[in-house]
Amino acid sequence: MSVQQRRLPVYKKILEENKKKWMIKEFLEYRLSKYGYIDSEILKTPLGTRIVIYAERPSRIIGRKGAIVKEVSNILATKLGVENPQIDVIDVSKIEAPEMFPKVVAYRIANAMAKGVRFRRVMFAAIRQLTEAGAKGFEIVVSGKLSTERARFEKQTFGKLYKIGYDAKNRVRRAVVHVLLKPGIYGIEVRIAPASLQYSDEYKIKPPVRPEAAAQQQQQ
């Protein structure tokens, strides 16, 4: 850390750190999206900066003999000024079904459309995968020149999915991906309420326990 950075006010230090984290995330998504990149966590440690990458296909991100990870680490250190970057790649399938991550679903739709598959066919395939994975609710929106020269959008929804409020902002997962085809740019937006999500208004009322039953339970 330079002398100038040490003299910065606290709020400016926080802004600088958040700006650098955003730049790292943007670079990782740009460089690794075609290899199954989903998300990342950036953690400051006494030994440097630990970057945890969540991926659908970890072996592709690591590369042959770790070539891709080494290249990314070198760019982060030289171009973005990340101090001693240490990259760990985690397979999301060991944590949760990949279909519960909207970025995975959005990239699958984008890649299929880039190969010439019709958008409706891809959307229905994604709907089938999400329902089989047990998603509580989801919404898929594809926008662009779908069937005419004028841009429009098509939306498919399923289950219980909140669009406003605390749950929608902090618990429902959302991702937006763009794909460039011959007619123009298409946007794919995916929102998913994962199977493990419990909404704030979902609760169970326990039936009252009679005093006699409570006394018997204590005796037992």
From Swiss-Prot:
Positions of the KH type-2 domain: 24-93
HAMAP family linked to this entry: Ribosomal_uS3_A
Keywords assigned: Ribonucleoprotein, Ribosomal protein, RNA-binding, rRNA-binding
The keyword Zinc-finger is annotated on this UniProt entry: no
Signal peptide: none
SUPFAM superfamilies: Prokaryotic type KH domain (KH-domain type II), Ribosomal protein S3 C-terminal domain
Family: Belongs to the universal ribosomal protein uS3 family.
CDD domains: KH-II_30S_S3_arch (cd02411)
MF terms (GO), sorted A to Z: rRNA binding; structural constituent of ribosome
A Pfam family matched in the record: KH_2
A GO biological-process term: translation
Descriptive protein name: Small ribosomal subunit protein uS3
GO cellular component, one term: cytosolic small ribosomal subunit
Lineage: superkingdom: Archaea
